[in-house]
Amino acid sequence: MSAVLKSPADSAIADISLAEWGRKEIRIAETEMPGLMAIREEFAAKQPLKGARITGSLHMTIQTAVLIETLKALGADVRWASCNIFSTQDHAAAAIAATGTPVFAIKGETLVDYWDYTHRIFDFGPKGSEGEGPNMILDDGGDATLLMHLGKRAEKDASVLANPGSEEERILFAAIKAKLAEDSTWYSRKSAQIIGVTEETTTGVHRLKEMSAKGTLMFRAINVNDSVTKSKFDNLYGCRESLVDGIKRATDVMIAGKVAVVCGYGDVGKGSAQALRALSAQVWVTEIDPINALQAAMEGFKVVTMEWAADKADIFVTTTGNRDVITFEHMKAMKDQAIVCNIGHFDNEIQVAKLEEHCQWEEIKPQVDHVIFPDGKRIILLAKGRLVNLGCGTGHPSFVMSNSFANQTIAQIELFTHPEGYDVGKVYVLPKHLDEKVARLHLKKVGAMLTELSDEQAAYIGVPKQGPYKPDTYRY
């Protein structure tokens, strides 16, 4: 296969010869993704996404390849980039590019490349044509959505690009300035037909809600992250398996007997803490929320502060979606050879920029660095502070991603086929009956048998016999 394949012109991938390997792994993943395969079977004949032009910004993994091919099977035209510079699996990108779908994703790409690729996934047709840009966005972390909003604002007011707050912002702002110098209405045209966005993760949802509250969100949005079958499965059970896989692949460290600090005890933090404890680490948790802190304490975790724990622990994991969770001062206090990593979306959970400014770096292998302080002490930083499970491992298992991506696919169908049911500028979650549908699609694979209510039982507790079974306020 590799002897006859040529890298497509409308793609940017590492090596097209990896396509056959990628295709073999995609076939295996399909057997572990019953939700997506059932959706293909249910909707393929109806083609509900025919006419959809989907700009996708989400980790270009084997599991994402199954999502992309599901969207295409339902009629969509798709262009794709990774939402993280380290998370691409190059064989997955090659396999999708080999089918003719434009893919812009290379593991270890530069930030300059990243923003170039994020621009290129909006180029569906010639300038001025009806299908020039997308009519849907599928986002993870909100960068594709951010690009449209910030670029359109900059068309009218260049001062919004005047004061970047970080190196990544400097590169983003430079990319927007370059695009505007080339085409002064590019962002307005590309965003003109966008019906809505479906957002995968906590960080991106936060951005959407912020824009919605300010009245600046330009299109409809569905918050996929807060579907129960996403947040309580991907965030919890996915991280429970992929965190330690990433740490182990990167360091080969013995986790048993170590002291590990998990910063944050939301769903991601809960899964991370459980995983480390399962390997017999002594796990401590930091929290800002008294409810989450009490949950951690009731599960037997010691609840501490970073200031108290910095010089005592061996492994540190950030899970919060916030900034400056592990500071330069914390890292100065750490033991020699302490391991520091992040499983939240962005690298600013750890003050990596200050490490770059004040310390020497020595690459041990890709995505594993010794950071050397002036006194000679070294810490091991994984994935340069970006997602450790995808930077140093292969991310979540296929089965749990089937839950998340089934939600994404259903959300895309909902927004594209029923836009009148969703107001521009507002953020929605999928209704409970669709959440329950996603769960049903996965029960057979794990050998689960569902008990059915009798008519009398349903009437007694006041729910429909076929669901939904819980009020929207139920926490699971």
Swiss-Prot record:
The gene is ahcY. Pfam families: AdoHcyase (PF05221), AdoHcyase_NAD (PF00670). GO terms for biological process: L-homocysteine biosynthetic process; one-carbon metabolic process; S-adenosylmethionine cycle. PANTHER family: ADENOSYLHOMOCYSTEINASE. It is an enzyme of class 3 (hydrolase). Belongs to the adenosylhomocysteinase family. The keyword Iron-sulfur does not apply. One of its GO terms (cellular component) is cytosol. This is Adenosylhomocysteinase. Its main location: cytoplasm. Keywords: Cytoplasm, Hydrolase, NAD, One-carbon metabolism. Its cofactor is NAD(+). Its EC number is 3.13.2.1. May play a key role in the regulation of the intracellular concentration of adenosylhomocysteine. Binds 1 NAD(+) per subunit. Substrate binds at T61, D140, E200, K230, D234.
